[in-house]
Amino acid sequence: MNPVIKKFQFGQSTVTLETGRIARQASGAVLVTVDDDVSVLVTVVGAKQADAGKGFFPLSVHYQEKTYAAGKIPGGFFKREGRPSEKETLTSRLIDRPIRPLFPEGFMNEVQVVCTVVSTSKKIDPDIAAMIGTSAALAISGIPFDGPVGAARVAFHESTGYLLNPTYEQLQASSLDMVVAGTSEAVLMVESEAKELTEDQMLGAVLFAHDEFQVVINAIKELAAEAAKPTWDWQPKPEATALLGAIRAEFGDAISQAYTITVKADRYARLGELKDQVVAKLAVEDGSPSASEVKAAFGEIEYRTVRENIVNGKPRIDGRDTRTVRPLNIEVGVLPKTHGSALFTRGETQALVVATLGTARDAQLLDTLEGEKKDPFMLHYNFPPFSVGECGRMGGAGRREIGHGRLARRSVQAMLPGADVFPYTIRVVSEITESNGSSSMASVCGASLALMDAGVPMKAPVAGIAMGLVKEGEKFAILTDILGDEDHLGDMDFKVAGTSKGVTALQMDIKIKGITEEIMEIALGQALEARLNILGQMNQIIGQSRNELSANAPTMIAMKIDTDKIRDVIGKGGATIRAICEETKASIDIEDDGSIKIFGESKEAAEAARQRVLGITAEAEIGKIYIGKVERIVDFGAFVNILPGKDGLVHISMLSDARVEKVTDILKEGQEVEVLVLDVDNRGRIKLSIKDVAAAKASGV
C-alpha cells in the first residue's frame, strides 16, 4: 500500500487529495479532505466494454451523505440511510453537469461515480470537495476524459467583494451563492442564486471562480502524474462520411425545409416521415449500415442543418430572429378555489402554477447533516408526459424535476417577504402542461404571478429567460428564449432569472470549449433585454401583490402575551390550548417570547381563538363591569367567574342595598350576573360587587 498524497492551499483552506489507500479496486478512488471540516471519498468505475445497441452515454453520479459523518444515527424504524434526499439529488446533478461533456463523443461505456461524505464538521458544504474528488478520480482512472475539472463556491458582499469557498455562516450574510466548474481553459457550469446583483457582478463572480480554481486543476494534474493508470486504448468509430453525404445529397433540402415548419407537432411528424424514408432507402438488414446507424446519421444531418442556418443568419426553427421572445399569454386567478394561481404561456411552453398558504406547522421538516430545520417555502415542479404529447411513466419526481424545481425556487426566493412580515408557509406547484423549451423559466414567471395573486407581499416581480448559443468556428449566434430543439442542438444552455433591478438566479451549462468572456457578457445583456420585456407584459396583468389574501387562504392573527401567561394558555399537559384548537378549529403557535400566531380556516375561527386567548391572559380591571357566572355559593357570599380561570368574591354585604339573610335568596349556582370589580389585592384576589353595578353604570363606567 503506497498512497499518493497531494496538498494545496485553496483560499483559506488546505485541501488534501489522497489515493491508493482506500477503495483500491475501483478504476479511480480519491479521498478529499478540506482542513478538518470535510472528508469525501470519491470512486469511479468504468466498464471496459460498451453494452451492444446502447445509443447514449450511461454515466451515473451518486452523491450520498452518511449520517455517521456528522456523528448522528438515522431516524425512522430501520435506522439506516434510505432513498436520496433532495440535497443529495441536486448535488449529484451538480457533479454530473460539468463532467459529462468532457467524455469523448461516441464513448458508450458505462461509468459510475460515487461520492460519499464520510466526515463533516457541519461548517461548509461538502459539494465542492465532492466535485474536486470526482475530477481527480477520473483523472487517475485511465477512462477517456478531457479533464481535469476545477470547482469553487463564491459569495459576495458589497463591502468586501468576492469570497472564495465561504462557510455556511458566511453565506447567510452573502448576496450570492454561486458554484462554478470548468477546465483550465473554459467555464463549463454555473449554478447560483443572488439578491438582485447586476449582470457585471454575476459575470465577475464567474471569472473570479475560474481564476481561483486553477490551483485545483494543477494539483489534480500533479496527482495524476504520479498515480494515474494507463489511459484506455479506446478509439471512436470513424465518421460515416459516405452515409452522411448520401443523406445530405438526397434528403438535405427536405430536412432543411422541414425545419421551417413552425408548429412543433407538425415539424416532428414531417421529420419522422423523412427519417423513415431514409432508413427504408439506405439501411441494410443484418448488414452495414444498420437502421440504428442510419438514424444516427440522420440526426447528425439535422444537427448540422439547424446550426448552419442559425450561424448564417437565417430565421430560427419557428421563424424568429435571435433576440425575439415568443408570444406571451398571461392569466392570473384561473382556479377559483386555490389561494393563488397563474397560467403562463410562452409559445408552445405552458405552466399552470398554483400557490398555497399554510401555517407554520405546514413547513417542511428537513433532517440534514447540519441538523433538523424547518423550510417554510417549497416549490415543486411537475413534468407529465402529456406536456410533450407522449405516453410515459407517472410517479414521483425524478432528478430533472427536482433540479428544475430548485432552479425556480432559487429564482423567486430572494423576493419573498421575511417570516416577521409574512409568517405563512408557502408551497408553489408548477404543472408543466405544454413544453417546447425553457419550462423552468416559465415556472419562474408563473410562480411570481401566482404568489402575487395569492397576496404574498413580494418585494418585486420575477421573470426568467433561457438563452442558447450556436458556435461554428469564429461564428456564433446567441439565441433568446430557446426552443427544445435549440437546447438539444446548441452549445450552451444559459438561464437567467431576476427582477428589473438585478439577477436572482443564473444557471449555465456549456457543451464546448471556447466560450469567452465576450460571449457570456453578450448573453447576459441579451437576457436582460428579454427579461425586462417579459416583466413589462407580466406587470400589465398584475404589477404588484394583491392587497388582501385570498378568501380561501387561512387567516392569521398575531398577538403577544406576557411570558408568565404562556403556561396558562397551554394548560396542564397542553389541555387548555388543545381545547381551544378543537373548539374553534384554529391552530395556535406560541413562541418562548410570548409571540402567538393564530391560524384559522376563516376569520371567524381565528377571531374566536384570539378571544379565548385574551380571556385567559386578561387581568381583571378595577372599576370595570363584567358578566360573570356564579360558580360557588358559601355562607359569606358567592364566587363568580369573570374571566377564564379568574373567580372573584361577592361578599354577602355586596349583594344588595337591602339586608340579605341568605345568599341563596339572591343567587343560585350557574346564574349569570353583572358584577363590578372593586379591588384586586397583591395576591391576585378579586373583590366584586353586585349592588354597586347600577351606580357605576349611571356614572358612565
UniProtKB/Swiss-Prot annotation:
Instruction: Give the UniProt record's GO annotations in the biological process aspect.
Output: mRNA catabolic process; RNA processing
Classification lineage: Bacteria, Pseudomonadati, Pseudomonadota, Gammaproteobacteria, Pseudomonadales
Compartments annotated for it: namely:
Cytoplasm
Supply the name of the protein: Polyribonucleotide nucleotidyltransferase
Residue stretches making up the S1 motif domain: 623-691
**Subunit-structure text:** Component of the RNA degradosome, which is a multiprotein complex involved in RNA processing and mRNA degradation.
| Domain KH residue range list | 554-613
What EC number(s) does its UniProt record assign?
2.7.7.8
Q: Which residues bind Mg(2+)?
A: D487, D493
**Entries under HAMAP family matching the protein:** PNPase
This enzyme catalyses: RNA(n+1) + phosphate = RNA(n) + a ribonucleoside 5'-diphosphate
Q: Name one GO cellular component term.
A: cytosol
Q: Which family does it belong to?
A: Belongs to the polyribonucleotide nucleotidyltransferase family.
What cofactor is this protein dependent on? Mg(2+)
| Keywords carried by this UniProt record | Cytoplasm, Magnesium, Metal-binding, Nucleotidyltransferase, RNA-binding, Transferase
The protein's job, in short, is: Involved in mRNA degradation. Catalyzes the phosphorolysis of single-stranded polyribonucleotides processively in the 3'- to 5'-direction.
Q: Which Pfam families match?
A: KH_1, PNPase, RNase_PH, RNase_PH_C, S1
For molecular function, the Gene Ontology terms on record are:
3'-5'-RNA exonuclease activity; magnesium ion binding; polyribonucleotide nucleotidyltransferase activity; RNA binding
Principal location listed in the UniProt entry: cytoplasm
The protein's matches in CDD domains, at most eight in alphabetical order, are given as: KH-I_PNPase (cd02393), RNase_PH_PNPase_1 (cd11363), RNase_PH_PNPase_2 (cd11364), S1_PNPase (cd04472)
- PROSITE patterns reported for this sequence: KH_TYPE_1 (PS50084), S1 (PS50126)
